[in-house]
Amino acid sequence: MLARMLNTTLSACFLSLLAFSSACYFQNCPRGGKRAISDMELRQCLPCGPGGKGRCFGPSICCADELGCFVGTAEALRCQEENYLPSPCQSGQKPCGSGGRCAAVGICCSDESCVAEPECHDGFFRLTRAREPSNATQLDGPARALLLRLVQLAGTRESVDSAKPRVY
């Protein structure tokens, strides 16, 4: 009788510990366990935007070098698929701000929002071949500086409400 009660109590304790543990036994964990995420190579995030020219930066953010960033718009809908992929991804060229990466000229994006960032001006030069027609106006000197300053000012005067769809 005592042995039976001891077995029942021991079984109940074991099952309780198993139920309350948050190990990778029954949860959706990466291959190799939770610590294996830091060992995994980051893949390029999904393409998005017009013509697939952009890359996802978050579930509702799509940025392209030439087009800027789309936040909460139809161009960023494909980025919601990233939530269902098992491996982590990374977009952008260099780190900026607090946990973000440079997404376009003067724009730093994290997975939640985008802000104007002066340190994101370097490294975004569109390279075109001589044979390739360009539909963009090439700005140099004062005109470029003025345009970038206007983008920065527009970014600092935005409201905190990030629920509205925006194009940067």
UniProtKB/Swiss-Prot annotation:
PROSITE patterns: NEUROHYPOPHYS_HORM (PS00264). Residues 1-23 form the signal peptide. It comes from Mus musculus (Mouse). One of its GO terms (cellular component) is extracellular space. Belongs to the vasopressin/oxytocin family. The record marks 32 as: Important for agonist activity on V1aR/AVPR1A. One of its GO terms (biological process) is negative regulation of transmission of nerve impulse. Disulfide bonds join 24-29, 45-89, 48-62, 56-79, 63-69, 96-108, 102-120, 109-114. It is found in: Secreted. Its main location: secreted. GO terms for molecular function: neurohypophyseal hormone activity; protein kinase activity; V1A vasopressin receptor binding; V1B vasopressin receptor binding. Keywords: Amidation, Cleavage on pair of basic residues, Disulfide bond, Glycoprotein, Hormone, Secreted, Signal, Vasoactive, Vasoconstrictor. InterPro entries: Neurhyp_horm (IPR000981), Neurhyp_horm_dom_sf (IPR036387), Neurohypophysial_hormone_CS (IPR022423). Neurophysin 2 specifically binds vasopressin. Vasopressin has a direct antidiuretic action on the kidney, it also causes vasoconstriction of the peripheral vessels. Acts by binding to vasopressin receptors (V1bR/AVPR1B, V1aR/AVPR1A, and V2R/AVPR2). Interacts with vasopressin receptors V1bR/AVPR1B (Ki=85 pM), V1aR/AVPR1A (Ki=0.6 nM) and V2R/AVPR2 (Ki=4.9 nM). Interacts with oxytocin receptor (OXTR) (Ki=110 nM). Glycans are attached at residue 135. This is Vasopressin-neurophysin 2-copeptin. SUPFAM superfamilies: Neurophysin II. The modification Glycine amide is found at residue 32. It holds the Pfam family Hormone_4.
